Amino acid sequence: MKEIEIIKPDDWHVHFRDNEILNAVVPETTRHFARSIVMPNLIPPILNAKQAIEYRKRIEKAIPKSDHFQPLMTIYLTEETNKYELKDAYNSGAVFAVKLYPAGATTNSDSGVKDIKKVMPILEMMAEIGMPLLIHGEVTDKEIDIFDREKIFIDQKLDFICNTLPELKITLEHITTSEAVSYVKEANKNLGASITPHHLALNRNDIFVGGIKPHNYCLPILKREVHRQSIVQAAISGNNKFFLGTDTAPHLKEHKENSCGCAGVFNASYCISILAQIFENYESLDNLEKFTSINGALHYQIPRNTKKIILKKENEPILFKTSISVGPSNIVVFNPNFPVFWNVKN
């Protein structure tokens, strides 16, 4: 097989940041994707419709004229969020979903939720109007091992939300464990999960073996190979509960390569090529389109895209650019630990 055609993909989890970084990274996503859910964890975070609309306008200015792209905006959930303002924001079309960050779980999440029960009235309202809840599924207790934070969040927090509000549309984002895969499979139809290309490609050895690899450091952190295999099987299965959310997360090189480096992998540039290679390696190319282009739209109950893209398999591995420029600095581009032969044709 030399070429395949798929429905133009969607990225159901993207970080565009702001200002110079935003202008540099937006075209890397809009080249290959039709829609993206945009994360709200800026400094300061996106807390209301007015801020979301202003942020969307900044994103739209950075989209190349040749690309047709729709940013889907989110609001950062806090214990002070006004549920009536949130309802108006959703009903007006200004906001697509709400993001729940446990306080301190990841980049710019200090304003997040400390007590799930305090936001339950907001979640009840969201269930009533059909507004999706996006969850960074990790506990943040300092005594909890970082490799166990997703599993414990599912047991202690997610299960409570799902059982209390089974009608709430929930996405457990960037899953990394076999426990997450099993929980999502067994849950009702309103719970889905996004999976990133770097969690499909790497395990925790890829951070530590042969020296620290700061550009493979992300949150949730990479897990054991057995967990990677579990999420790969979920992604390639065609099961419509699992879909692509790249969690592409740009940081300047100097903010990654230091004594306390930032968490995040910038994977937008070659995401689709990497996924095609992974699916081919597992003899599952027939399910690539479901994962990248169909399952997410089904979960969010919106129409799938009408445009298509063509992927071509080259005779030699494609050459990845190492970085993209941002002013005097740059952002390192994710490159997996295997050859990639698939190219997206323009």
Where is each model-derived feature located?
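His/Asp/Glu-enriched, well-ordered alpha-helical/loop segment
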Residues: 163, 235-304
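Short, acidic/polar
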Residues: 19-26, 80-91
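Short helix-capping segments at alpha-helix termini
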Residues: 60-68, 163-167, 188-189, 283-284
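Divalent metal-dependent hydrolysis catalytic cores, especially in the metallo-beta-lactamase
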Residues: 11-12, 25-50, 66-78, 94-108, ...
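Histidine-centered catalytic micro-motifs
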Residues: 8-19, 133-139, 195, 246-248
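Histidine/acidic residue-rich metal-binding segments in metalloenzymes
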Residues: 84-100, 108-244
